[in-house]
């Protein structure tokens, strides 16, 4: 039981009473925040999804008052992400690449069979109609080896005009993955490969 007003300086890195008491206060407050987020945000979100016969998807990581394993247990499908930077095929961009393995670990710990990922997200340097199946295959294979088994393409919503090419885009942030792309028809074999 803490006097919150008395312990507010602990949030700025100051010691209140003693280092031990300050550490215990910060641990308890962070644990409480994590529990509240897991139950009242992610748990409630999943309950609302189920009430409407929907499945909850979530990326259970990044900065916030939460604990990844705990919130991942409150959702139906854990989702990681990986970005499609053509040069990153040969580099280890662990900032975004590690999330697939994290999501797979959370899913497997909770007995969930599906591990999804926001896949091939474009970056300003690479999302200039430069993506193509051969350039993306190695990255996808690496993510499959980390536990991915459901691709969720990071792309724009629609192409309303049937003959406009190349059509609408998300600007620099999404993969250009739709029927207006010049490689769409020849890429059927790759589509079948990643859908297996």
Give the location of each predicted region.
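Carbohydrate-binding surfaces of carbohydrate-active enzymes
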Residues: 1-78, 83-196
């Amino acid at each position: 039981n803490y006097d919150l007003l008395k312990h507010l300086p602990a949030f700025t890195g100051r010691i209140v009473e003693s280092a031990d008491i300050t550490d215990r206060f910060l641990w308890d407050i962070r644990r409480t925040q994590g529990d509240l987020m897991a139950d009242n945000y992610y748990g409630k979100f999943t309950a609302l999804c189920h009430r409407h016969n929907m499945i909850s998807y979530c990326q259970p990581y990044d900065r916030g008052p939460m604990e990844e394993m705990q919130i991942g247990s409150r959702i139906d499908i854990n989702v990681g992400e990986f970005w499609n930077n053509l040069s990153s095929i040969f580099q280890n961009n662990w900032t975004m690449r590690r999330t697939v393995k994290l999501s797979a670990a959370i899913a497997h710990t909770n007995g969930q069979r599906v591990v999804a990922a926001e896949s091939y997200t474009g970056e300003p340097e690479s999302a200039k109609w430069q993506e193509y199946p051969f350039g993306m295959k190695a990255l996808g294979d690496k993510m499959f080896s980390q536990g991915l088994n459901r691709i969720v393409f990071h792309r724009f919503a629609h192409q309303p005009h049937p003959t406009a090419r190349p059509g609408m885009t998300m600007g620099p942030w999404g993969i250009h993955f739709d029927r207006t792309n010049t490689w769409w028809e020849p890429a059927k074999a790759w589509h079948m490969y990643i859908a297996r």
